[in-house]
Every structure is written in structure tokens, then in C-alpha cells.
Amino acid sequence: MENVTTMNEFLLLGLTGVQELQPFFFGIFLIIYLINLIGNGSILVMVVLEPQLHSPMYFFLGNLSCLDISYSSVTLPKLLVNLVCSRRAISFLGCITQLHFFHFLGSTEAILLAIMAFDRFVAICNPLRYTVIMNPQVCILLAAAAWLISFFYALMHSVMTAHLSFCGSQKLNHFFYDVKPLLELACSDTLLNQWLLSIVTGSISMGAFFLTLLSCFYVIGFLLFKNRSCRILHKALSTCASHFMVVCLFYGPVGFTYIRPASATSMIQDRIMAIMYSAVTPVLNPLIYTLRNKEVMMALKKIFGRKLFKDWQQHH
């Protein structure tokens, strides 16, 4: 008979057990986290302070930046601490808390990306009614719906995982506390947990992905057949390409991790995918959305001072 116990704490194995590599990983992830804070923080400040960015598109972009900062902050600070500390234990309550916020913020981002695609669809395909359809009340309602749906989705996973019985090893083969590696340590029946993880997570992520895909294809088709302006077509294609790149970087690793069959699961692959959607994608989002965006670059010049840019241009 299995020794069923109530776990008071878990032990993270982390990214690697090789001591010599840990300072290297610490430096890499510290740089990634700082770039994330600076990049997304700058966008958030610009959206709040610059009146010309007070539009639905930038309202959602500000939400995305806030999410990216919070999403990475759920996992990366703990990872950095674990890379420099010998003790990597966390209480069971701390484990469930991290799990909850990771899924809460991650699923909010998945839904928000679909909302952003819908916003671009309305702006390009129905520009005359854009301000009527995407009025401030609708924008707030859509954003609030994304946050609320995701909160209860994450709460479902947290409650169901908290009610599992754990036995044997306390060692978690991951660098943060997620549902899948925790289910491997459970000695009670996890069939319902696994089913919900695949079906519900799949419905949220793949549903949002296909809505985004549909919006992008409809926009491209609309412009090709209804619009003869090369300038407008180029601008719209650039916007769709940027958003589609972000979508693929986020949904691809999420789908690979949570939707594929349990028999095909590899913890090494899961860790690589988790690094992609929890650390790398939040860093790339500001670059993808703002590098070719003239409005954002102009707002950046206004906020951080024209003189700084003039001095930089003179020296280069």
C-alpha cells in the first residue's frame, strides 16, 4: 500500500543540476527579466501618459504589457533565487499560489491576443464605425471579461490540484510549479485533472488562436479585394504580421506543452517550451509591436525628451 502523505513543501530541481552552469543561467535570465521590465514598463508608461495613445489599440497593448510583466514575475524571480540558493523548497500553499497566478495571467494573455486581433479587424474592415463599436465601455468590458474568465479557469486548476493526495518524492522536475509536473507526483486519481488541463486549456488557447487567425486572414482578404491603396495594404499587413508573430510565439509552445498526449510528454521539452512562453515571448512583445510603430516612437521621443534623441543622432 502506498504511503499517502500531506505534503508541506516541494523541492524544485530547477533548470540544471550542474553547478558550473548555474551562474551562466542566472546572468541570462536576469538580463531577460530586466529587459522585460524596462520594455513593457516603458510601453505602459507611454500608454498612460501620452494622450495620442489613448485609443482601443493601445489600451489593449497596455494591458498586454502589464500582463507580460506580471506573467514573468510569477516565475523568473523565484528561478533567479533558486539559481543562487542551495535550498529550493517552497510551501504547498506557495506552490498552489504560483500555479494559480501562472495560469491566471497566461490564459488572460491568450484571450487578450484574440481581442487585439478583433480590434484590428474592426479598425481595418469597418473604420467608419470603429469608434462606435470599440467605444471605451466595450474595451473595458472585453478586458474585464478576459481577466475574469481566466481567474476562474486558474481557480479551477488550483482547487483541483490542492485536493490531490501526494506520496513519495517531493522533488518537482521543473523550474516553477505547474500543473503537469505536480500531477506526476500525485498518488490519487488525476484523470479528471489531466482531462480538464487538455480540454479546457486547449479550448481557451486554440479557440483564441483560431479567432486570431481568422481575423488576420479576413483582414488580408478584405484589403486585397476591396482596397486598392498599396500604402494602406502595406500598413495593415505589417500590423497583422506583427500580431501573428506574437500569437505564434505564445500559442505554439502553450499548445505543445498542454495539448499533446501525456504519452508524448518529455520534461526537458516542457521546460524549453515553458522558457519560451514565460520568459522569451514577454521580452519580444514590446520589440515586435513598437519597432515599426511611428506613433509609439513619437510618444517615446516626447516622454523621454527630444534633446536626448538629438544628441544621440549627432553622435551617430
From Swiss-Prot:
Record carries keyword Repeat: no
Subcellular localization(s) per the UniProt record: Cell membrane
Molecular-function annotations in GO: G protein-coupled receptor activity; odorant binding; olfactory receptor activity
Extracellular side: 1-23, 74-97, 159-195, 258-270
Domain of life: Eukaryota
Disulfide-bond pairs as recorded: C95-C187
Transmembrane domains' residue ranges: 24-44, 53-73, 98-118, 138-158, 196-215, 237-257, 271-291
Main localisation: membrane
Keywords associated with the record: Cell membrane, Disulfide bond, G-protein coupled receptor, Glycoprotein, Membrane, Olfaction, Receptor, Sensory transduction, Transducer, Transmembrane, Transmembrane helix
Membrane topology category: Multi-pass membrane protein
Keyword Cell membrane: yes
Pfam families membership: 7tm_4 (PF13853)
PROSITE patterns, per the entry: G_PROTEIN_RECEP_F1_1, G_PROTEIN_RECEP_F1_2
SUPFAM superfamilies named in the record: Family A G protein-coupled receptor-like (SSF81321)
Family membership: Belongs to the G-protein coupled receptor 1 family.
Function: Odorant receptor.
UniProt-recorded name of the protein: Olfactory receptor 12D3
Annotated organism of origin: Homo sapiens (Human)
